[in-house]
A protein has these predicted regions:
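Alpha-helical transmembrane segments of multi-pass membrane proteins
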Residues: 2-545
Length: 545
């Protein structure tokens, strides 16, 4: 069987031959790098292209992101239902990539037509938001459905065991690595030097290249579908599996919620530009990829559920670390941007500051996905269906997190309460998994009480005490989350150059931006928007305003 398995094969005196999948593993990793690169190029181009139709407000961006991720979620669920496991996974993957490239080119033609339809039917309020969603669905759902189906398709190329499924974490990590490259390539080179049409052609060429390589590999590695095994799931209760789905959904919710909150705060510090967004996204994706690779390695252990629970609990500290660094440390680094001889020098400093803040938490979010896969795996499972469910749960959480934090939490509660909510969500996710682990160990203890202590990471009493201590630390982190400095809202990245701070009469955070009103000792009042002075009561400004 052409499947990924690390179990030795008995072959007498003949040398052991590597299974085809293991032999082609480097090529498969490269395929996922190319797939991720093309996907992020499309995402950046489509966002800019469709914003010309429905606008660039926070609500429009939320609709765009929700449609994009919703399509990927549906694709991950639908492929296992409509594509038989008997089909060669690599051929299915190649067909998906070729179709993505073709649809990517079609979007260039369809979007201008959607623009004429949108402007001809002006609709306001909730109906207008729904109308924008319909237009986004028409443009983005077909290609994003196929994008979401790629990982479940290739998942059938591995065995449904913790060791086999752990390789999916490496595939996921390589896909994210390609996404980082695509993000940087599109944001800093292709769109700057060329235009959206040329950039789309590059992404489509990558898709077609990946499809060609995948098809060639499928001819050299024949596939025989897995033989269904009797279900031996007594120890894997439905409640325990559902707990993993809930936890990975909450993990996706907190990850995208944090990206919304931290993008708002870091944009104050680094400046609101496409380069800042690309830097934040690239650093976040690098950390996710590193975490996914680490999680894939850890997933081979006998306790992936325990590892998942601890990763979620450690996220409470990671979010608290980012909140502290963004509010109390990074804005006050003695850096004067006006002294930089080149924007590229400033970009290097920005990368360092973003990494210091978000890297720890993003690594833990990246590790959670392969750990969740290994936590629900069973010998009788269809690997494609398994990956589809976990991926869908994570994506649904991500969609909810993006919408909830961008439309409700930040505008109405503020970024500080948003970060507190993120810590609480991570704590809840950890407690859900810890409860499932405890129930499973209680069942094991009835049959093999001694094995339970020797095979776990730590004895049960010590593990319980550590979990309680971690929960207490998380609650302390919720209370200790600091407020955003008023000076950061007022002066942004130039805050270190203002040694004498004015009196702040008002500071607020809205759905699109953060604003402040300050009064200097001389009585002059300034109106600040997103770290810049937009108006003042000085006579020379009053004549121009």
């Amino acid at each position: 069987m052409a499947k990924l398995s690390l179990r030795p094969q008995q072959s007498g005196s003949q040398p052991l031959a590597l299974p085809p999948t293991q032999r082609f593993l480097p090529a498969l990793l490269l395929l996922f790098v190319g797939s991720g690169c093309a996907a992020l190029i499309y995402e950046i181009v489509w966002f800019q292209l469709i914003e010309l139709v429905i606008g660039s407000s926070a609500i429009s961006l939320g609709v765009l992101l929700g449609t994009f991720m919703g399509g990927m979620c549906l694709g991950s669920l639908l492929l296992p239902r409509f594509v038989s496991p008997a089909r060669h996974p690599l051929r299915v993957y190649a067909a998906l990539e070729a179709a993505i490239g073709a649809l990517g080119l079609i979007v260039l033609v369809v979007v201008p037509l959607m623009g004429s339809i949108y402007t001809a039917t002006p609709v306001q309020g909730l109906a207008g938001i729904l109308w924008r969603g319909v237009l986004c669905a028409v443009c983005l759902l077909p290609p994003t459905l196929l994008m979401g189906a790629t990982l479940p398709a290739i998942a059938r190329w591995v065995e449904a065991t913790p060791t086999g499924v752990s390789w999916l974490g490496f595939f996921y990590g390589s896909n994210i690595a390609g996404a980082v490259f695509g993000c940087v390539l599109a944001g800093f080179y292709l769109l700057r030097v060329f235009d959206m049409t040329v950039t789309t052609f590059v992404a489509a060429a990558v898709n077609f290249g990946v499809a060609g390589v995948g098809l060639a590999l499928s001819r050299r590695a024949p596939h025989r579908p897995a033989i269904p095994r009797p279900a031996v799931e007594a120890e894997r209760s439905a409640a325990g599996i559902n707990a993993i789905y809930v936890a990975i959904g909450l993990s996706g919710l907190s990850a995208l919620g944090a990206e919304v909150v931290w993008t708002r705060l870091l944009s104050l510090m680094l400046g609101a530009s496409v380069y800042t967004f690309s830097i934040i996204l690239a650093v976040f994706l690098v950390a996710l990829g590193a975490g996914s690779s680490a999680g894939a390695y850890i997933a081979r252990s006998s306790r992936p559920r325990t590892a998942l629970a601890w990763s979620q609990l450690l996220l409470t500290l990671g979010v608290a670390w980012a909140a502290f660094m963004i509010a109390r440390a990074l804005p006050f680094w003695p850096i004067n941007p006006s002294l930089s001889p080149s924007p590229w020098i400033t970009f290097q400093l920005d990368v360092v500051r973003v990494a210091v803040a978000v890297f720890p938490a993003a690594v833990l979010w990246g590790a959670s996905f392969p750990l969740a896969l290994a936590a629900v795996v069973g010998p009788s499972d269809d690997a494609g269906r398994l990956v589809g469910r976990v991926y869908a749960a994570n994506t649904v959480g991500a969609i909810l997190g993006s919408a909830l934090f961008s439309v409700v939490v930040v505008p109405h509660w503020g970024t500080r309460h948003g970060e507190q909510l993120l810590i609480a969500i991570s704590l809840a996710s950890a407690m859900v998994v810890f409860a499932a682990v405890r129930r499973a160990r209680a069942v094991e203890a009835t049959n093999e009480r001694d094995a339970q202590r020797s095979s776990g990471w730590v004895p049960r009493p010590a593990g319980t005490l550590l979990a309680v201590a971690g929960a207490a630390a998380a609650i302390a982190c919720v209370i200790a989350v600091p407020n955003v400095p008023d000076g950061l809202v007022a002066y942004g990245r130039f805050l270190p150059t203002y040694t004498n701070q004015p009196k702040y009469l008002y500071v607020g955070e809205g759905i699109n931006s953060s604003i402040a009103v300050s009064e200097e000792p001389s009585g002059v009042r300034n109106f600040h928007v997103a770290g810049k002075v937009e108006a003042s009561s000085l006579p020379q400004d009053m004549r121009l305003q």
